[in-house]
């Protein structure tokens, strides 16, 4: 059996690069190896927010918030998923909400100092209709999934094309 796989050739290099930049590896099921000790990470099933990381960051950024404020913010984000606004309400929560902060964007230094960064592989994402998918790599800030990366072996044109079509279908928005 070859010591090289799709994981070792295309998934691990960007994952290791993100970890070298300060991203903390997290796992939905938990993972303990010679190199990684990741406890099981809880996530909100509707938003895929990593609840423990989100709550910790929320109270760091909003120290005078009430005890249930982080949970209320997750509920607010859940409700915003029903909007056909292309994520505008969520954008406003991150960038324009001056009362409660969920990500510190006040300056580049504060961004790195006051936020936490996580990365996961093969994290199941989906919606209430059961449309689930597992991106190769998901990137989080303060437990909030903000980006995902799909990786393919070089010269895998059929795989790249198939993934492109899946994304077009999955992320279509009403006109």
Regions found by a protein language model. Give the residues of each.
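An alpha-helical interface "stripe"
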Residues: 1-175
